[in-house]
Amino acid sequence: MDDFRKYATKHLGMNAMVLDDVIKSQAGYLNPYILEERQLNVTQLDVFSRLMMDRIIFLGTQIDDYTANTLQAQLLYLDSVDPGKDISIYINSPGGSVYAGLGIYDTMQFISSDVATICTGMAASMASVLLVAGAKGKRSALPHSRVMIHQPMGGAQGQASDIEITAREIQKLKKELYTIIADHSGTSFDKVWADSDRDYWMTAQEAKEYGMIDEVLIKK
């Protein structure tokens, strides 16, 4: 923290009072930054933005509308600046909103660049759908990663007709998600349906055998 304080006051022109306000507003967390020197020019970037310059995107949170919008924008931008060049998404997520996740999925399928997916910790629920949706032959996981599939969850209240409408929508989503997993994994729809009735956990090797990934990454 002392080094950061010295850097901020010397190079960013922040006085001690402003710096204290910034630190307090971050509630103890500072987004990681790096300094990159290019032809005598120094550029300050957060580490995730620097990695995106190498076409690497991180999905390391629960999937919600904000996360989905950001990730879709990153995919569209990288595809526009260099169409057809691979993009990598590193996934460590418990899942989240199905609708937000389907927006990411459709964008992955829409762009011309192949999207490689790598599970670095956990790809559960909707995140597992994004993992399996990577380009064939370019889906992988680290050895101790976990992959989990299950049926979509939801709830409803109000009039009986409203509950019926919500229940029908959940059933549609269920079939849609299972079809995506079956199509990309090569596992039969009936097996995906049966396995997803409850939380179905897989190790990296089991996920490979299931068709969720193509390779378990092991350092050679």
Curated annotation (Swiss-Prot):
Tell me if Magnesium is a UniProt keyword of this record. no
Top class in the EC scheme:
hydrolase
GO CC annotations on file: cytoplasm; endopeptidase Clp complex
Q: Where in the cell is it found?
A: Cytoplasm
Instruction: Locate the active site.
Output: S125 (nucleophile), H150
Identify the keywords attached in UniProt to this record, alphabetized: Cytoplasm, Hydrolase, Protease, Serine protease
Cite a single GO MF annotation. Answer: ATP-dependent peptidase activity
**What CDD domains does the annotation carry?**
S14_ClpP_2 (cd07017)
Q: Which reaction does it catalyse?
A: Hydrolysis of proteins to small peptides in the presence of ATP and magnesium. alpha-casein is the usual test substrate. In the absence of ATP, only oligopeptides shorter than five residues are hydrolyzed (such as succinyl-Leu-Tyr-|-NHMec, and Leu-Tyr-Leu-|-Tyr-Trp, in which cleavage of the -Tyr-|-Leu- and -Tyr-|-Trp bonds also occurs)
Q: Mind telling me which InterPro entries this protein's record contains?
A: ClpP (IPR001907), ClpP/crotonase-like_dom_sf (IPR029045), ClpP/TepA (IPR023562), ClpP_His_AS (IPR033135)
Its EC number(s): 3.4.21.92
The Gene Ontology biological process terms listed for this entry are: protein quality control for misfolded or incompletely synthesized proteins
- PANTHER family for the chain: ATP-DEPENDENT CLP PROTEASE PROTEOLYTIC SUBUNIT
Listed under subunit, the entry gives: Fourteen ClpP subunits assemble into 2 heptameric rings which stack back to back to give a disk-like structure with a central cavity, resembling the structure of eukaryotic proteasomes.
Which NCBIfam families does the record associate with it? PRK00277.1 (NF001368), PRK12553.1 (NF009205), PRK14514.1 (NF011091)
Question: What HAMAP family does this protein's entry cite?
Answer: ClpP
Protein role: Cleaves peptides in various proteins in a process that requires ATP hydrolysis. Has a chymotrypsin-like activity. Plays a major role in the degradation of misfolded proteins.
Family according to the record: Belongs to the peptidase S14 family.
Name the chain's protein: ATP-dependent Clp protease proteolytic subunit
Corresponding gene? clpP
